[in-house]
């Protein structure tokens, strides 16, 4: 009996260490990010966990919106939208959208008049990738859909398939695309809750989006989501 209890105690200890990331390869839901001294980071306001609309009201009000005013989004609004798409919600790294194996293959960017920002869920911050307004380039890549050029912010959801392939092989493509849909719906519902609107766009030239944003070669764009104030 004592031997059995001792073995159980050892197993529990090892499992606890693994879940806290002490053993490499164990899925903790946290992607490692190596900071560079040259990287310009933007601290985002803490996300709000209580809004003014119920989930049911948000679902009923959601519509695809393609026309926007020129009003820019506030940093608080951008912060809330990024958190809704991929924010961390529990200590071990779980996020707002479910992920197969907690491998989190998605990366979210947002293009505004002030530049291009890459969301880092760890620490809830954004990295400045460019100080250029790249929305016109995205508009051209997106088959000249006016919503892309008119919106004050265009969110770009990309996928790094290798993160999921290492565990799920050929099934990874399906799981990653399902996950992108989860994140996009979170983003769109959060927009409604903030009094904003948006539209998910899948019609674009992948290579042109990658080129416009100077994305890493393994970041495949899956969504362009223009968001702004309703006209």
Where are these regions (language model features)?
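Bacterial N-terminal signal peptides that target proteins for export
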Residues: 1-9
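Small-aliphatic-rich amphipathic alpha-helix that forms the alpha element of a beta-alpha
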Residues: 62, 81, 108, 153-157, ...
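Solvent-exposed coil/turn segments that connect beta secondary-structure elements
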Residues: 86, 113-115, 122, 158-162, ...
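Short, surface-exposed helix-loop/turn micro-motifs enriched in polar/charged residues
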Residues: 100, 200-201, 217
């Amino acid at each position: 009996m004592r031997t059995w209890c001792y073995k159980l105690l050892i197993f529990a200890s090892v499992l606890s260490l693994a879940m806290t990331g002490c053993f490499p390869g164990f899925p903790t839901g946290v992607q490692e990010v190596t900071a560079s001294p040259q990287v310009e980071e933007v601290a985002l306001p803490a996300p709000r966990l209580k809004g003014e609309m119920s989930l049911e009201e948000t679902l009923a009000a959601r519509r695809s919106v393609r026309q926007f005013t020129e009003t820019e989004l506030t940093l608080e609004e951008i912060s809330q939208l990024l958190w809704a798409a991929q924010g961390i919600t529990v200590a071990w790294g779980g996020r707002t959208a479910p992920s197969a194996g907690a491998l989190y293959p998605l990366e979210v960017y947002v293009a505004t008049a002030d530049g291009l920002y890459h969301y880092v869920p760890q620490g809830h911050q954004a990295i400045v990738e460019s100080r250029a307004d790249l929305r016109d380039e995205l508009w051209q890549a997106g088959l000249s859909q006016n919503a892309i050029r008119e919106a004050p912010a265009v969110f770009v959801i990309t996928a790094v398939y290798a993160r999921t392939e290492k565990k799920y092989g050929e099934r990874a493509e399906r799981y990653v695309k399902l996950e992108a849909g989860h994140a996009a719906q979170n983003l769109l519902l959060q927009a409604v809750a903030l009094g904003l609107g948006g539209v998910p766009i899948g019609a674009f030239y992948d290579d042109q989006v990658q080129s416009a944003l100077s994305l890493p070669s393994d970041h495949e764009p899956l969504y362009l989501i223009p968001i702004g104030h309703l006209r």
